[in-house]
């Protein structure tokens, strides 16, 4: 089926990832995947990091779980890593960092390769997850593609979310979430409580 045959090809084509079918979940658009992340990780007053500004739909999804937000400014080459380090030193129990690294919504900025690597290093040092929301990746018309953060990840710290809504058709409402197998088991339990779509 789609889960077994098509998804590994899709992840390889779009993100350069060698992910098995057991690491990918189909969702009803990227928004459902974002909400599933909130359900999986957040309790009231948990600390998370978002870019400032960021995608409003993500904030609306996370708001349901009443987290404490820490905002990191976005520079011309992506998230301000120095500012993020200050937050992590003050709040080392951050649950995750939510980022839109490719053509960031709403700024349109793409995170540099150096900053992607630095963000991953911090995730390993402070033991938090990176939520890489990347629905705009293939809207690039000039310049070289920057490797996805998930492609750079060797320690299972990245949860990659994407969808067809921006590159094919919003009406499809088809997205996907890629994570390590342990997290996928958790997300499958959550999704089974939300709908019966395989």
Regions inferred by a protein language model and the residue ranges of each:
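Single conserved hydrophobic/aromatic residue that forms the stacking wall/gate
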Residues: 1-5
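Conserved core of the PLP fold type I
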Residues: 6-126, 137-139, 144-155
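Short, Asp-centered acidic motifs that coordinate Mg2+ and/or phosphate
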Residues: 94-96, 128-129, 159, 174
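Glycine-centered flexible beta-alpha turn that most often forms the glycine-rich phosphate-binding loop
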Residues: 133
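Conserved core segment of the aminotransferase class I/II
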Residues: 154-198
């Amino acid at each position: 089926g789609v889960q077994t045959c098509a998804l590994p090809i899709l992840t390889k084509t779009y993100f350069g990832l060698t992910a098995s079918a057991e690491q990918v979940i189909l969702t009803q658009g990227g928004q459902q995947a974002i909400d599933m992340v909130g359900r999986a990780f957040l309790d009231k007053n948990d600390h998370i990091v978002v870019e400032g500004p960021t995608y409003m739909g993500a904030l609306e999804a996370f708001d349901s779980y009443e987290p404490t937000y820490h905002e990191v400014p976005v520079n011309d080459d992506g998230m301000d890593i120095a500012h993020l380090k200050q937050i992590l030193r003050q709040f080392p129990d951050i649950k995750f960092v939510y980022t839109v690294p490719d053509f960031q919504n709403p700024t349109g900025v793409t995170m540099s390769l150096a900053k992607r690597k630095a963000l991953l290093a911090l995730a390993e040092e402070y033991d938090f997850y990176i939520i890489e929301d990347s629905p705009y990746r293939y809207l690039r018309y000039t310049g070289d593609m920057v490797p996805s953060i998930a492609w750079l990840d060797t320690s299972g710290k990245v949860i990659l979310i994407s969808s067809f809504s921006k590159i094919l058709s919003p009406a499809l409402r088809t997205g996907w979430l890629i994570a390590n197998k342990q997290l996928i088991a958790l997300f499958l339990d959550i999704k089974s409580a939300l709908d019966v779509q395989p």
